[in-house]
Amino acid sequence: MNKIYYFILFCFAAFCFTACSDDDPEFSGIEGKDHYISDFALNVGGITYQATIAGDKITVEIPYNTDLEGATAAYTLSEGATINPNPSTIQDWENEWKFVVTSKMQESKVYSYTYRYADIEQSGSVVLATQADVDNFAETGINRIDGNLTIGTADGEEITNLEGLANLKQISNTLILNPSYKGADLSGLDNLEQLGSFKLGSIVSTSKNTTLKTVNLPSLLGVVGDFVINSSVIEKVSIPKVTTIGEDLYVASDALLDLDANAVESIGSSLIVKGSVIQKGSATTEAIVFSALKRVGSELAIQYFPKLQGIYLPALESVAGTASFTDMALIGSIAMTELYSAGGLTIKNCKEISTIELPGLTSCGEFSVDANKVNKFNISALRDAFGNMTLSNLLIEELDLSRINFNGNTLTLQCNRLNKIVGSETFNGNLLLLPKSCRLTEFTLEGILNMQGNFECEDYSLVKRFIMPFVNVAGDITIALNSGSVDTGV
């Protein structure tokens, strides 16, 4: 009896399942769940450009100068899926689109469409000697040059605009501008992103181009080699997105008004900015700013700016060579608060400078400051002097040297108001006190017991009391006082 009961129950359940299945769509395997685009392409003028589909991104790569007007789409969906909007209804393929693909089971996936230009590379150097050459370059669609690009000649046909270079994004070697280019700026190179190097003139010779006033490369991101401008007429240099320059950044111009390189963080070799091409201050620049610069691989020099009032290097940490600031009549202060290492430092012919702030400097090579209005001088973190140090004409009255190791080098002090020096117990170097026309009546050396080098002091003609508590002087000692007494333990 039980067997008959279970048999009847089984048949009833099977009947119900069959009845329910008749009411639902029939799916085989995963057929009803798929919601993807398996193939996508655009056809432009009879040419098909196959898309790359990566995840939910559809990207069509087309050559430069390709017009997508009139383009049509071909695509393949998973079986049973639908797409919205329908690509066959779209005419404007220069815009980005989003497509929703929906499966039979109403599961959806969103795809994003975009396009990009394919690189067309020219192997070898390119010379564009005439305006026609520049104009015709646009028709090639080339956006990368694996070599030099030379624009113009020494004295040939004039080139007045660079619009034919609008597609250009990369020059692996040097961009050279010759005098026959007569444009006032570099409009046409607005999309250039990478350069091997840039040459307008050279470090040793001035460009003969007299019409170019502005070097503007708004999209440039990096320079592998040198960026050199040596011109008597350049007024503005604008490379606002460049972050690295592999070798030299050299800018010299009699007419320089503005330099925008505020994204530059690293310069592999030297940074040289001059307000003159003939070592005579001419440019009327009032401020020089490198707000992101951290490292200079060799020399740093800013010089020949008679109107310059501010130098701003707030992020600068290291200069492998000498940092020199010279021939700037109006500069009032130099502050490099993050600088911790310099191969050397020179400040001279800056007659209005009163403040020198180097609070983080811990090591320096040859160090020379000659400035007769400096009354604030901060080198409080200095620990190692790896070259001679000379301070001339500063208005400081006290100087603390107690934490500095001079490593056998010479400290020369020619400061008429300096009346007190504090040193460590052992002074590891030579100390020369050589003021000019000094009118001090008292001078004190405090803390120094052992002088490991030479000691010399001269021209303290009015000093009545000269205190130096030396116990030992390893080298020569010279003391020339016209009057007064010397209190020493030597």
Task: Please place each PLM-identified region on the residue numbering.
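Small-residue (G/S/T/A) turn/hinge positions that recur once per unit in extracellular repeat modules
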Residues: G45-A51, G80-N84, A166, S219, ...
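Extended Gly/Ser/Thr-rich low-complexity repeat segments
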Residues: L68-E79, F290, L401, G423-S424, ...
